Structures are given as structure tokens and as C-alpha cells.
From Swiss-Prot:
Residue ranges annotated as propeptide in the record: 24-25
Leader sequence segment: 1-23
PTM statement from Swiss-Prot or TrEMBL: Contains 4 disulfide bonds.
Homology family: Belongs to the Cnidaria small cysteine-rich protein (SCRiP) family. beta subfamily.
Predominant subcellular localization, coarse grouping: secreted
The keyword Manganese appears for this protein: no
Sample GO molecular function, one term: toxin activity
Compartment(s) where it occurs, according to its Swiss-Prot or TrEMBL record: Secreted; Nematocyst
Function: Induces neurotoxic symptoms on zebrafish. Has also been claimed to be implied in calcification, but tests on homolog proteins suggest that proteins of this family have a neurotoxic function and not a calcification function.
UniProt keywords, alphabetically: Cleavage on pair of basic residues, Disulfide bond, Nematocyst, Neurotoxin, Secreted, Signal, Toxin
Name of the protein in question: Small cysteine-rich protein 4
Domain of life according to the entry: Eukaryota
Length: 81
């Protein structure tokens, strides 16, 4: 019985450790975005617009280095070429 309890506690501890690591990574990404470390927000002006992910209209190309506020949106940049 003691072995089962010990195993259960180890499983719970492992799950909490993984959950903490994932949420910590999300906080680090948010912090990096706020300070310009990874990528910057799509401007939503004439040259950069947020559209549904993977659906840039004619004259625009996908700009993966910029992000929109929603995971279902992607930034599209005016394609000058």
C-alpha cells in the first residue's frame, strides 16, 4: 500500500512540475513580446493587417514575425513585389 501511495504522489508531483513549466514558458513569451524580444504586434495599418490565419488576400503575404491578438488571426503584410 505504501508503494502505491508513493507512486501516486510522484505522478502528481510530476504533473504539477510539467504544468508549472508550461505556464512559466507562456509568461516568458508574453514578457518577451512586451519588450520586443521575439516579435511585435501587427500594426493593422495599410501595410500590415490581421486576417484569419492562412487567408491573406491578394497583394498581401503572410508575416509570421508579427502577431495578432487572437490565435485564430495571422498578420499579413503588403507585398510590394
Amino acid at each position: 500500500m505504501d508503494t502505491k501511495v508513493a507512486c501516486l504522489l510522484l505522478i502528481i508531483l510530476g504533473a504539477l512540475t510539467v504544468q508549472g513549466a508550461v505556464s512559466g514558458n507562456k509568461r516568458m513569451n508574453l514578457h518577451a513580446r512586451q519588450w520586443g524580444g521575439i516579435e511585435r504586434e501587427c500594426m493593422n495599418n495599410g501595410e500590415e493587417q490581421c486576417f484569419p490565419m492562412g487567408q491573406c488576400p491578394g497583394g498581401f503575404r503572410e508575416c509570421s514575425e508579427y502577431y495578432c491578438g487572437s490565435p485564430s488571426l495571422g498578420c499579413c503584410c503588403w507585398d510590394e513585389w
